[in-house]
């Protein structure tokens, strides 16, 4: 397993004083104490529960599971996310302090999995709701893969600049808790690739903040969510 590299922490003076920046020091302290909020809804979460045992021992990474989003800086979604779960997941994410990170674990979380073709109540990808930092495919992923995903997230944090992260999040649009999911009628015309199309009301009747958390500088032709 590769170790986390710090580009500025190896510059030592003759007096054995580490020369670094406050940003690198903050990143080092955060990656050594990631406190996850476990959002498990199906079988993928059982694989993550295996990490608690002595065989994998995820405590060595500083991972301390928290039950409150206000004490967590990492949310790990494992399993299917339904339409009814979506507002609560977004609410939990908004209650987490900055900086915060997301790991999407399993095919059902990333794309909807086996429910992505003809299910009327499944969200086809958790990245439609909250920004995802690391995608972990599998059905379900092995505990070794979860450790590898956490290692990659630690490497990402070690090279991160907070201002760049905030700027990149503002480019994308994510739903807030004020957004209401409406179930559309299914369209069965014989093709398995036909999904469910949701068209919100006209934007002239509702303010823009009802739909999106961040405003994008690029114009969008329409506001449609395909699940």
Curated annotation (Swiss-Prot):
Cofactor: [4Fe-4S] cluster
Locations listed in the record: Plastid, Chloroplast thylakoid membrane
A GO CC term assigned to this protein in UniProt: respiratory chain complex I
Keywords: 4Fe-4S, Chloroplast, Iron, Iron-sulfur, Membrane, Metal-binding, NAD, NADP, Plastid, Plastoquinone, Quinone, Thylakoid, Translocase, Transport
SUPFAM superfamilies for this protein: HydA/Nqo6-like
Role: NDH shuttles electrons from NAD(P)H:plastoquinone, via FMN and iron-sulfur (Fe-S) centers, to quinones in the photosynthetic chain and possibly in a chloroplast respiratory chain. The immediate electron acceptor for the enzyme in this species is believed to be plastoquinone. Couples the redox reaction to proton translocation, and thus conserves the redox energy in a proton gradient.
UniProt protein name: NAD(P)H-quinone oxidoreductase subunit K, chloroplastic
